[in-house]
A protein has these predicted regions:
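Flavin-dependent oxidoreductase catalytic cores
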Residues: 1-178
Length: 178
């Protein structure tokens, strides 16, 4: 859709994968071996002629072979009119099947995204083994304390002593109702 190149970085799937694979190799070479390397992919473009799940599975295999540890599976965003034009039905967890398929077919850790707003949905995705991590980007804009609220929802002690002091002192007061 946007890659109209006809050199080694365009054309067929291998050409279109070349640049992200070279970047992954360079980052892995510079990044400490004991730290995980995440790569976010647009699993599908959601429009005719665009990137599809088979392409993403192939890319994930190649990324894993180059030392990537986690594939963050998003979608859309490469349409001339933006992500909102992608032919994807949106709803809570609508992109989770992308992470699930990559996890299953590539045997690599995945991160699920896509309107995961409620702690119960996030936990169910993890418990069902559909993904290994959950991203709550836009929801964190609405509720910057989403992780704390999720812990409280599940009656988990937030143990503020383990939090950075600049956050812990206030959150502990807030948690106790000031």
């Amino acid at each position: 859709l946007s890659n109209k190149r006809n050199d080694g970085y365009g054309g067929d799937r291998q050409g279109r994968m070349r640049f992200p694979l070279e970047v992954a190799e360079a980052v892995r070479a510079a990044w400490p071996k004991d730290k995980p390397l995440f790569v976010r992919i647009s699993s599908v473009d959601g429009i005719d002629g665009g990137w599809e799940m088979d392409d993403s599975v192939a890319l994930a295999h190649e990324l894993k072979a180059r030392g990537v540890d986690v594939i963050d599976c998003s979608s859309g965003g490469n349409s001339p009119k933006g992500a909102t034009n992608a032919n994807l039905t949106r709803g809570p967890g609508y992109q989770v099947p992308f992470a699930e398929r990559v996890k299953r077919e590539v045997d690599i850790k995945t991160m699920a995204v896509g309107l995961i707003r409620e702690p119960d949905l996030a936990e169910q995705i993890l418990q069902d083994g559909r993904a290994d991590l959950i991203a709550v980007g836009r929801q964190a804009l609405v509720d910057p304390f989403w992780a704390l609220h999720a812990a409280q929802h599940f009656d988990i002690d937030p143990d503020f002593e383990k939090w950075p002091h600049q956050y812990a002192w206030w959150l502990e007061k807030w948690d106790k109702g000031l």
